[in-house]
Amino acid sequence: MAAPQCHALVHRVLAECPVTKARACEFRLPHGPVKTPVFMPVGTQGTMKGVTADQLRNLGCEICLGNTYHLGMRPGPEIMKKAGGLHGFMNWGRNLLTDSGGFQMVSLVELSKVTEEGVQFRSPYDGKEILLTPEKSIEIQNALGSDIMMQLDDVVSSTITGPRVEEAMHRSIRWLDRCIAANSNPDRQNLFAIIQGGLDAELRRKCLQEMTKRDVPGFAIGGLSGGEEKDHFWRMVTLSTDHLPRDKPRYLMGVGYATDLVVCVALGCDMFDCVFPTRTARFGSALVPWGSLQLKNKQFAKDFQPIDKNCDCPTCQRYSRAYINALFKSDTAAMHHITIHNIAYQLNLMRSVRDSILQGRFPQFVQDFMRTMYSSRDKYPQWAVDALETVGITLQ
């Protein structure tokens, strides 16, 4: 067991919803404060697709996510060190979270073989064999200089059952200890543990019991959002938040749909990330409080309203739906404008959620959000109805 460390993260709970498990917190990191609940946009190779660091800053983003697997391959840790870490490389003066590279074990499974030592990859760039160990993952993340680093965990698809899930859970605990020992900057870089256990409540409980014994500054709920039934998903989320310490951040990995964000805040989660808002923008889909608009469709060719008249993002302040629709015929700028809007939508949604918690009206916020998103009670997803019921919100 590692000795207690001096962490670079100071966490405060500012308000808790008296009905649900929702909470508004603030934690201070080396590159400034982060107010939660928070959505973190994802930049795979040190940049948001179609958005500059300045634009992200202007949207009020306090923390974004970089991918260790891709950045470790190209441009690589040596170049990162010379650039002054990932902050210097992408000219980003705010906070960064880097993942461990473990998720690619699922998404690039044909490239990988898992042993106790680590994950054997064939590089998609040059075909070379690479062994990503817990130590190597932390070495790369130390070179990147991220404010929050994730442990390397043994990731299996959330739809898999049986002995492989138990093996992955126990291995993730052992790998956490190796990651803690390998972190050369604990006073500047915060290492988060990742709770595994698949959809097996007993395994997840065991993992929670073991990992919460470790002196780490925060915890992530991993191994979900991979195609499992939503009914299983929310039950594993609530089981996890029930057993995680109150005084540390709780990060639900890979969640980005608006309804999922609101429900999982009610279940006690603080931090979220997902490629969804940027990926869906590339297909012409703009996020709005009542769902999404497919701006490529010809119905928008003569629609001179902004995407959302209540949105204060640069896209909605300057351009019409018709203009963006026209851009799709000849220009990639359409995707850029929608990406800006979609990131702003996610950040604004989480600010509204937070304000409602601070003002003691979160349950009413949830009622209003669901009514706007789905127009009628019979369209509410049953999993969301059931999940909210368990934390004291009966949807009207």
From Swiss-Prot:
One of its GO terms (molecular function) is tRNA-guanosine(34) queuine transglycosylase activity. It is found in: Cytoplasm; Mitochondrion outer membrane. It comes from Xenopus tropicalis (Western clawed frog). PANTHER family: QUEUINE TRNA-RIBOSYLTRANSFERASE CATALYTIC SUBUNIT 1. The active site is at 99 (proton acceptor), 273 (nucleophile). Zn(2+) binds at residues 311, 313, 316, 341. This is Queuine tRNA-ribosyltransferase catalytic subunit 1. One of its GO terms (biological process) is tRNA-guanine transglycosylation. It catalyses: guanosine(34) in tRNA + queuine = queuosine(34) in tRNA + guanine. Pfam families: TGT (PF01702). Belongs to the queuine tRNA-ribosyltransferase family. Its main location: cytoplasm. Catalytic subunit of the queuine tRNA-ribosyltransferase (TGT) that catalyzes the base-exchange of a guanine (G) residue with queuine (Q) at position 34 (anticodon wobble position) in tRNAs with GU(N) anticodons (tRNA-Asp, -Asn, -His and -Tyr), resulting in the hypermodified nucleoside queuosine (7-(((4,5-cis-dihydroxy-2-cyclopenten-1-yl)amino)methyl)-7-deazaguanosine). Catalysis occurs through a double-displacement mechanism. The nucleophile active site attacks the C1' of nucleotide 34 to detach the guanine base from the RNA, forming a covalent enzyme-RNA intermediate. Keywords: Cytoplasm, Glycosyltransferase, Membrane, Metal-binding, Mitochondrion, Mitochondrion outer membrane, Transferase, tRNA processing, Zinc. Queuine binds at residues 99-103, 153, 196, 223. Residues 254-260, 278-282 are annotated as: RNA binding. Gene3D superfamilies: Queuine tRNA-ribosyltransferase-like. NCBIfam families: Q_tRNA_tgt, tgt_general. The keyword Transmembrane does not apply. It is a peripheral membrane protein. InterPro entries: TGT, TGT-like_sf, tRNA_ribo_trans-like. Heterodimer of a catalytic subunit qtrt1 and an accessory subunit qtrt2.
